[in-house]
């Protein structure tokens, strides 16, 4: 997500961010992948579905809980995403709300983002900025899907559209293989980009 937002943040400061992540089972390690595989076999064979890694069955299900709960009702994963986003983009005042959901996908996290900016950014401006970003981000006319974004370093961004409820808002969809394109390499590329464009 930050890979997609970094070039937009250069055009105008982000004041508010609302995001929902759809995180693959590989985010829980190889054990998470094995649990999904085993559950799919159990379902196909008509057996009782067992689980150890996730709080409930993940096959044919989604679980809106990643990490443990904080006193504010957000999970540790959600708070990490909020805090890291502010830090990476150098926007400590940015308001962020997010929900992190585990989905029955092997690889590649997906995220729906609504970003609100100080100044209006057109879809054309956003598309051009993301397309010219040198951080392995691909602006897609097709719909990015985890099935096709896995096992590569690119982060795919699509469905860029103006918000219907925020005058200076944009809504977009991102997919990327978090195993190949992890948070650390993203952060380094974003910091390098922001430093070079000060």
Where on the chain are the PLM-derived regions?
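C-terminal active-site/capping subdomain that shapes the small-molecule cofactor and substrate pocket
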Residues: 93-198
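Active-site-lining helix/loop region of Rossmann-like oxidoreductase modules
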Residues: 1-129
